[in-house]
Amino acid sequence: MRLTAELCCPGHRMPLAADDGTPEITLATRFLSCRLGCQIPVIAGIPRFVISDSYAASFGKQWKAFRRTQLDSFTGVAISRDRLTRCLGGSLDAVRNKSVLEVGCGAGRFTELLLSSGARVFASDLSSAVEANYDNCHGAPGYFICQADLHALPVYLGSFDVVVCLGVIQHTPEPEKTVAALCSFVKPDGLLVIDHYRYGPEDMTPIRQRIRRFLVGRSPRFSLGYVRFLVALLWPVHRLLWHFRSHSSVAAARRKWLSISPVLDYHDYYSQLGPRLLYAWAALDTHDALTDRYKHKRTVEEIRECLQDLGMEGIEARYGGNGVEARARKPLANVDANERINRSDLIETC
């Protein structure tokens, strides 16, 4: 994995080098350092700019447990490709030969698609999910990954053609600050692509809310085990009701069951996955829905207003996918401001 031109010491805004002086990070690399003496540990081939998963620990456990579940290359179904294509405006050509920052990369469902579409991808995640992403994507040309906090990301401001953050912002403490940070890494005339949960009928059911209150704050290991047991217990009912759904009485019973079951069920949306993968997706997304510490909701108008307040242009925001999907461009006028910040935002220690 090669060091990238965008990578820098987050404290001193200067280049980082591997301990052996080469431009490559390998499993033998112990740390990265800047010329002022900061050292960033490299563990299992991945630079670690944070020492813990913080509020994202459950996601780290989740993505390592379901490392390939949502990868199109594993499922053989273009669910992730369709979503990414739609969010990019209709074509993956938007990232070809572009530098792309992917924040909250998880296990790599979008990372692998960005790479296969010809992008140079700088992937990052706050959680240990980076290990699953590395397992799935390392070796691909143009791939770099690190574990880091968005608000202290080790890259120069205004240095990426495209910044992608999907399925993430709603899980951060302050979504508007998250969007502002994402915008800061977009080049002038570059593209920002985001999404966010919406208010609506898909909100948490009462039983899911109660279980979530019980699980949030517990150890990731306990929460994952609890959800796996819950899904194993209830999934046979989901399958049975789906199988006999053509009977009107069963269809009515199924609608009622789906309104009270804490298990997420994708039979109506992704039946092409087949029974085995539908079960895996149910376990994955039920865990995701019941263990996230933050679960914010926003309207299209709120997302659009946020982007406008940040000075973004060409804003397109609409309801779709997981909620609100939006993209916007940074105006060319921001080029000088980014340069000034990169030169002056220095501190004495990391």
Residue ranges and their predicted role:
Residues D125, Q147, G167, H196-R198:
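Glycine-rich, histidine-containing beta strand-loop boundary motifs that form or position
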Residues V162-P173:
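A short SAM/SAH-binding and catalytic strip from SAM-dependent methyltransferases
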Residues M1-L157, V162, K295-H296, E302, ...:
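Conserved N-terminal segment of class I S-adenosyl-L-methionine
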Residues I207, S219-Q308:
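Substrate-binding/catalytic lobe of Class I Rossmann-like enzymes that use SAM or dcSAM, i.e.
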Residues E176-P188:
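A short glycine-rich, Lys/Arg-flanked "PGG" loop and its adjoining helix->strand segment in the class I
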Residues T26, L166, V179-L182:
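N-terminal cap/leader regions of alpha/beta-hydrolase-fold enzymes
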Residues L191-G225, A232:
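Conserved class I S-adenosyl-L-methionine
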